[in-house]
Amino acid sequence: MGIRKYRPMTPGTRQRSGADFAEVTKSKPEKKLTKYVHRKQGRNNQGVITSRFRGGGHKRLYRFIDFKRDKRGIPAEVLAIEYDPNRNARIALVQYTDGEKRYILHPVGLKVGARISAGEDAPIELGCALPLEKLPLGSNVHNIELLPGRGGQMARAAGAVAQLMAKEGDYATLRLPSGEVRVVRKECYATLGQVGNLDAKNISIGKAGRQRWLGKRPHNRGVVMNAVDHPHGGGEGKSPIGGKPQTPWGKSALGTKTRKRRKPSSKFIIRRRKTASGRG
């Protein structure tokens, strides 16, 4: 994938860049693998805003992605590489020898016509899914299960890759894209390779309207609100916060850990992810 620069014909295109879609080989999705999903606009089932600054955006068809890779021992061929509006990564359409078609995340280097498979006896090749206990140390993997049979939950975004660092007893140690080091059961499946579309993080939006196409509404700061709306609000003119940074609901912000202190899975985290302040 490459980055396409736009000529500065208007203020909106002056700083704009986008993907060149060079790896995409098919424009229309597989109809049986799509579904229209009503967009929640950041509301819950009572219509109350639970996630601010969301709404609008272009209509999307949801593509059903095979995160479980549960067709074990059946080879598949890559038919096409497609664009998915629901994620930054590209997706690959594969067809198994029994005729079934599925979508999977497209790893870097996987070409149309390549053959992949999943299972304990699958080859150690790009795009194949195997249990962690069958993979050699140092392998780069993505779409990693947290619990056996649940389906991949970690390292699924564009450019994401985790590394298998150790295998000891019933557990395997992984270094995740965030820098976190954690252990998971060796029976958990992972897919070999790095998720494609590496330059997704380097794209410049260019104008506010393009954010609206993505369903993102303007994010206004608390310091410009009224005192009734935010702890940072109020005052005459440009006034400071007058205290420690807080969320709209009065909780401490900027650097405060938000993970539950007694979460059972914390015992599987060997080293926490890196933070902006440098504290793990």
From Swiss-Prot:
Keyword S-adenosyl-L-methionine: no
GO molecular function: RNA binding; rRNA binding; structural constituent of ribosome; transferase activity
Pfam families associated with the record: Ribosomal_L2 (PF00181), Ribosomal_L2_C (PF03947)
Entry keywords, A to Z: Ribonucleoprotein, Ribosomal protein, RNA-binding, rRNA-binding
Ribosomal protein is among the record's keywords: yes
Gene Ontology cellular component list: large ribosomal subunit
GO biological process: cytoplasmic translation
Residue segments, region Disordered: 1-25, 230-280
Basic residues: compositionally biased ranges: 257-280
Subunit record text: Part of the 50S ribosomal subunit. Forms a bridge to the 30S subunit in the 70S ribosome.
Xref: HAMAP family: Ribosomal_uL2_B
Function summary: One of the primary rRNA binding proteins. Required for association of the 30S and 50S subunits to form the 70S ribosome, for tRNA binding and peptide bond formation. It has been suggested to have peptidyltransferase activity; this is somewhat controversial. Makes several contacts with the 16S rRNA in the 70S ribosome.
Family per record: Belongs to the universal ribosomal protein uL2 family.
Protein name: Large ribosomal subunit protein uL2
Organism of this sequence: Gloeobacter violaceus (strain ATCC 29082 / PCC 7421)
UniProt lineage: Bacteria, Bacillati, Cyanobacteriota, Cyanophyceae, Gloeobacterales
